[in-house]
């Protein structure tokens, strides 16, 4: 007999840096999950992914055990990294006026690579559609897509 699911918890955490402080502790604590076990498991699985933000969906069962699925990083995070917008000295989120002020550039080749990476979590199987979706996200952030 399968275990009974008591809840799902969705979080976005920096790779390799999960700790029991908020938001992880309170979110998992209210479901009775062993917080340190999750943090150790998540950190060991994501240690090689650098400073990317990793969305994770945690399934909590009635016996307080859990499993989790890691998704690909958000498109905006991947685009910022590709455009070179986020550095330690100058953290940036994009343009405040994306239709007037452009803050970076990505090439079609970079966009294609990002779309291929992101396709497993998107609702399309067509690479062109995924590229258009990524280009729209870039445009709304004030990032130019160049040939």
Swiss-Prot record:
One or more lysine residues are methylated. CDD domains: Ribosomal_L11. The lineage of its organism: Bacteria, Pseudomonadati, Myxococcota, Polyangia, Polyangiales. Forms part of the ribosomal stalk which helps the ribosome interact with GTP-bound translation factors. Part of the ribosomal stalk of the 50S ribosomal subunit. Interacts with L10 and the large rRNA to form the base of the stalk. L10 forms an elongated spine to which L12 dimers bind in a sequential fashion forming a multimeric L10(L12)X complex. Keywords: Methylation, Ribonucleoprotein, Ribosomal protein, RNA-binding, rRNA-binding. This is Large ribosomal subunit protein uL11. GO terms for molecular function: large ribosomal subunit rRNA binding; structural constituent of ribosome. The keyword RNA-binding applies. NCBIfam families: L11_bact. GO terms for biological process: translation. One of its GO terms (cellular component) is cytosolic large ribosomal subunit. It comes from the Bacteria. Belongs to the universal ribosomal protein uL11 family. PROSITE patterns: RIBOSOMAL_L11. Pfam families: Ribosomal_L11, Ribosomal_L11_N. It comes from Sorangium cellulosum (strain So ce56).
């Amino acid at each position: 007999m399968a275990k009974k699911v008591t809840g799902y918890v969705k979080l976005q955490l920096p790779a390799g840096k999960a700790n029991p402080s908020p938001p992880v502790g309170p979110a998992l604590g209210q479901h009775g999950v062993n917080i340190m076990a999750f943090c150790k498991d998540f950190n060991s699985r994501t240690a090689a992914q650098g400073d990317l933000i990793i969305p994770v969906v945690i399934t909590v069962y009635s016996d307080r055990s859990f499993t989790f699925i890691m998704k690909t990083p958000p498109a905006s995070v991947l685009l910022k990294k590709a455009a070179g917008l986020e550095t330690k000295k100058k953290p940036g989120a994009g343009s405040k006026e994306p239709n007037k002020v452009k803050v970076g550039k990505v090439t079609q080749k970079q966009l294609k690579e990002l779309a291929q990476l992101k396709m497993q979590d998107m609702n399309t199987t067509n690479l062109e559609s995924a590229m258009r979706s990524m280009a729209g996200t870039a445009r709304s952030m004030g990032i130019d897509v160049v040939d």
